[in-house]
């Protein structure tokens, strides 16, 4: 008997959805940063074992949109809860249910598939706090399963996999067993660069950063030559991203190259520039060029 199903991970921004997905896959597949709203596209990730295949949809965190990109991110997360077989609602025990959580719960009450409540970061919180959070959420909605985990340390991840297998239906293998992600290499490379920029820039530059890959070629020796732009919204952000004498941009390139080489399993040369695109997050045509679906 072979089972297969689509699983959506939902939760507030910065709750650890991408970290959970990476823990399940044991690979760095989805951009992980300490800053909220770092996942911008639904990333379908495929886990294939001997007797099942799970297709995970890692979504942007649900939040009140402030621009066209924000609208896209929220719509993307909401759409991901439709036509799936299982939903994982990820929360942190140290945070009381906020408006974002209540908004998600109202949506979850409408879905016709099993919903798991997954408590992340249990290693960082006392048992009393975890129990209190469990009680609070259980009173808001009935969940098929409640699983405490630590995505960062991998605690109870195998248990979570076992429970997901229990609930998904019998079905075909949708993707080849050696395929782990349905996004192309260029998309992943852009996300790696963006993650490094977010980490190194800290609070100096807000979320108005995007990455466009201009060129990605592989020579006869198997070496990739990559060129790209880091887009920012204000002229004042450009020197911050570049840094004194180009130091910040050099670090972004260096750290990105290391992860890109691990991802592509090849030597990589990368050149990055910084380009100002004012209000790019409200530019529908540019958002489309960067890979974001058109808003209806």
Curated annotation (Swiss-Prot):
Transmembrane segments: none annotated. The keyword Amino-acid biosynthesis does not apply. Its main location: cytoplasm. Monomer. It comes from Clostridium botulinum (strain Okra / Type B1). Residues 3-170 form the Era-type G domain. This is GTPase Era. GTP binds at residues 11-18, 58-62, 120-123. GO terms for molecular function: GTP binding; GTPase activity; ribosomal small subunit binding; small ribosomal subunit rRNA binding. It is found in: Cytoplasm; Cell membrane. Keywords: Cell membrane, Cytoplasm, GTP-binding, Membrane, Nucleotide-binding, Ribosome biogenesis, RNA-binding, rRNA-binding. The lineage of its organism: Bacteria, Bacillati, Bacillota, Clostridia, Eubacteriales. It comes from the Bacteria. PROSITE patterns: G_ERA, KH_TYPE_2. One of its GO terms (cellular component) is plasma membrane. Residues 120-123 are annotated as: G4. Residues 37-41 are annotated as: G2. Residues 201-278 form the KH type-2 domain. Residues 149-151 are annotated as: G5. Residues 11-18 are annotated as: G1. SUPFAM superfamilies: P-loop containing nucleoside triphosphate hydrolases, Prokaryotic type KH domain (KH-domain type II). It is a peripheral membrane protein.
